[in-house]
Amino acid sequence: MVPVRGQITAFRCSQNPTKTIWRTLATAEPPKPKRKRTMFTDKLNQGPSFADFVSGKASNMTIDPLEAARQDPDQRLPSWLKVPIPKGKSFHTLKKDVRELKLATVCEEAKCPNIGECWGGKKSEATATIMLMGDTCTRGCRFCSVKTSRKPAPPDPMEPENTAEAISRWGLGYVVLTTVDRDDLVDGGAHHLAETVRKIKEKAPQILVEVLGGDFRGDLDMASVLARSGLDVYAHNIETVEDLTPHVRDRRATYRQSLSILQRAKETKPSLVTKTSMMLGFGETDEQIMQTLRDLREIKCDVVTFGQYMRPTKRHMKVVEYVTPEKFDYWRDTALKMGFLYVASGPLVRSSYKAGEAFIENVIRKRNHNVGETPRLESASAAQL
């Protein structure tokens, strides 16, 4: 018989078999393991006590630090960052086209504030940024609102063909292709992107194609694969200054690695326009920005854009500073003096902001010039934006 806890059980004495010993088993349960502290517990401990409620001091106290950040005047948007709600016939037509053609755009996924402006004009002048290889990234940068996963769904092998067919029927003059980081793929998705570019050029050679790619985990050969695909603009964003990179970007993305990708693209095809983008407002200094511009010119990067970092959700990095339009104008002028061919700089500028409008005329002029001559591009200022 197996003794049961809490029952009175009889045992035979080993020294005297005729003697019976009655013993009650312990009824106390073994101690349960302590529960781990939770974030909710921490928030309660940081918040008002019972004495605060009794004294009436709790009315002005906030338990959630995120709520405190929301109420912080420094986190409120200044007037120059407020944009009207997207509307108009052209905007809704393009949005409908995106749904019917089953295209995923970073304009919508990343909550771009310029979607109404970029999609609001004529279709031939519109710029759309198409997201390839899914909407889930293998990295988790602290500024980005795109979904993350260690193992996203595999890329659709028919995506290059389907995307090219949809874009060729869409009627755009300029298209930007971008992608989430796919560290789960051996080549980082480089061949998938290159095949998409080739398919687009086969079906609609008049369309100018910009690719905003990742760093392929530093695999420079993959940067060469993409550079040779037939694209017109090779873009890779450096995002921020070197000192802040570990705090802003995923640990697998480094400042020097991004520079090497842009450099390899230019070395692979010197006539290729290379482009990068920086966000301001993370707490960077003027000297740090200047050093970044020097580094970019050293690798012969052609185009740079500056925009304001805007916190997508309360789970992301807080904005340290809202940079004024005048300061964006200063960086535009500074970059042009340093030799950049084109600079877009303004609070609402994003890496693909009106890319077609800025580049179509320039690419035509470059192709009409003699080999070795590089025409200077006009710049987009904060005032124009």
From Swiss-Prot:
It is an enzyme of class 2 (transferase). [4Fe-4S] cluster 1 binds at residues 107, 112, 118, 352. Its cofactor is [4Fe-4S] cluster. Its EC number is 2.8.1.8. [4Fe-4S] cluster 2 binds at residues 137, 141, 144. GO terms for molecular function: 4 iron, 4 sulfur cluster binding; lipoate synthase activity; metal ion binding. Its main location: mitochondrion. Pathway: Protein modification; protein lipoylation via endogenous pathway; protein N(6)-(lipoyl)lysine from octanoyl-[acyl-carrier-protein]: step 2/2. GO terms for cellular component: mitochondrion. Residues 122-341 form the Radical SAM core domain. Binds 2 [4Fe-4S] clusters per subunit. One cluster is coordinated with 3 cysteines and an exchangeable S-adenosyl-L-methionine. It comes from the Eukaryota. It catalyses: [[Fe-S] cluster scaffold protein carrying a second [4Fe-4S](2+) cluster] + N(6)-octanoyl-L-lysyl-[protein] + 2 oxidized [2Fe-2S]-[ferredoxin] + 2 S-adenosyl-L-methionine + 4 H(+) = [[Fe-S] cluster scaffold protein] + N(6)-[(R)-dihydrolipoyl]-L-lysyl-[protein] + 4 Fe(3+) + 2 hydrogen sulfide + 2 5'-deoxyadenosine + 2 L-methionine + 2 reduced [2Fe-2S]-[ferredoxin]. Transmembrane segments: none annotated. It is found in: Mitochondrion. Keywords: 4Fe-4S, Iron, Iron-sulfur, Metal-binding, Mitochondrion, S-adenosyl-L-methionine, Transferase. NCBIfam families: lipA, PRK05481.1, PRK12928.1. Belongs to the radical SAM superfamily. Lipoyl synthase family. This protein may be expected to contain an N-terminal transit peptide but none has been predicted. This is Lipoyl synthase, mitochondrial.
